[in-house]
Amino acid sequence: MNVRVTTMDAELEFAIQQSTTGKQLFDQVVKTIGLREVWFFGLQYTDSKGDLTWIKLYKKVMSQDVQKGDPLQFKFRAKFYPEDVAEELIQDITLRLFYLQVKNAILSDEIYCPPETSVLLASYAVQARHGDYNKTTHTPGFLVNDRLLPQRVIDQHKMSKDEWENSITTWWQEHRGMLREDAMMEYLKIAQDLEMYGVNYFEIRNKKGTELWLGVDALGLNIYEKDDRLTPKIGFPWSEIRNISFNDRKFIIKPIDKKAPDFVFFAPRVRINKRILALCMGNHELYMRRRKPDTIDVQQMKAQAREEKNAKQQEREKLQLALAARERAEKKQQEYEDRIRNMQEEMERSQANLIEAQDMIRRLEEQLKQLQAAKDDLEQRQNELQVMITRLEETKNMEAAERAKLEDEIRMKQEEVHKIQEEVSVKDSETKRLQEEVEEARRKQTEAAAALLAATTTPSHHHVEEEEEMDNEEELVNGENGNQDFSKDFDTDEHIKDPVEERRTLAERNERLHDQLKALKQDLALSRDDTMETANDKIHRENVRQGRDKYKTLREIRKGNTKRRVDQFENM
């Protein structure tokens, strides 16, 4: 018989025998994908009644109520959740599977997530998928086909696809330099503080017949009112429970406190009680295991994971250095190109100045020629005047008429000489001015020639630097399989401290995250459509108004002795 197993990011097909057990199929899956943290996961199938059910490891696959088909369909999913992802998840493959499953639950609204948190989570999801933001390759519209936000959040805000993309991209740029695995981890660290994260809900009734929800998670059992799955009203940590059992539809939980009555509720069907029992046993075992020293196998896994992470970090740092070297080389190349362009512009200006100076020199030379001609003309006229004056002095006995005529000629010649003297004076002044301009032009000509020479002899090696340092980043994950077992009687230790006593949300511990969420909330409020508000939105808003969060609520509902809480449950 063929079976198809769908993980969060792959489809696997196997051929099994009639005798193949659930564990044998499970082991084959985890070996194929390289998963060693097997205790969190299980194989899920749809039974003949259409309900999702976890495969029983020690029964034959073919004897279980798997919906018929060829191939038989199974989903490989996380069945149990860690208390703290940062402390417990070891392998990259485990991290990735949890990340994809939680992300899918948030996007499909199985886990309620406020709008501002949804946008911040989306920015980490983009970093996990695409790596660092690059404005050259990540152009507008790049995220148009990515499913990043719950449809509820999109419907509640009057924002275009471009506006959503801009909002997400703004925060995406904040994560520059973050490894993809680190982005997934940051996503989960924020998501695990959501009220519905990791909770399996079951419809139950108390002895009065009141319809309620039972929530089973890594921290214990919680009771919810029918119309509010965000805010538990009564809580029982695993450390207070010593035994669980059921008889038909009646489910019985025996507290460690022997003075307290049994905690009894009723499920609609026996099969529901079986699922509750299995989840309680698994979660309780993991709860107790976390409070014991790590096994040798887990220690080895953690050591290997640290080595792989360090190697990956070193490779990342090497890549960052290479990228930085490349950026420096590109910057120097750009500076060189800018310098060449500036030099070319300077050459053009210098060439223009050179032409202007040469033109001015030509004009000056022409002016000097004209000045010299005027001076020669003046000298000739002065000589002619002197000849006339000499003649006049030598012809004292000349007749009066001739003498008068000569005097008129001398006077006219004197006027001509005076006029020419003035012209020479003007030309002389103009020549001096032109000489000064020529000196300036020659200086510019010298500078232009020097600039031209410098531009044509500047070294051209500034753009070459460390090109050989560029490398590609390869990321691999490997692993083996492990084992787990269950018990109906719980190991107990009354000295175990309730982990929620000191637990704080990441936003409460991290001021930067708190400020980011606050800024996002303010931005989104401007486009919010209050008519699209859901019941969960209203409940969340009221919880925030009253200063409640996941762990504050859990601390509050676990106060008082067990008897008081059992009585409170009976009276709901």
From Swiss-Prot:
Region of interest (Disordered), residue spans: 456-491
GO cellular component: adherens junction; cytoplasm; cytoskeleton; microvillus; plasma membrane; rhabdomere
One Pfam family from the record: FERM_N
SUPFAM superfamilies membership: Moesin tail domain, PH domain-like, Second domain of FERM, Ubiquitin-like
Residue list for modification Phosphothreonine: T553
A GO BP annotation: animal organ morphogenesis
UniProt subcellular location: Cell junction, Adherens junction; Cell projection, Microvillus; Cell projection, Rhabdomere; Cell membrane
Keyword Repeat: no
Membrane topology category: Peripheral membrane protein
Compositional bias segments (type: Acidic residues): 466-477
Role, per record: Involved in connections of major cytoskeletal structures to the plasma membrane.
Subunit structure: Interacts with cytoskeletal actin.
Name listed for the protein in its UniProt record: Moesin/ezrin/radixin homolog 1
Protein source organism: Culex quinquefasciatus (Southern house mosquito)
Gene that encodes it: Moe
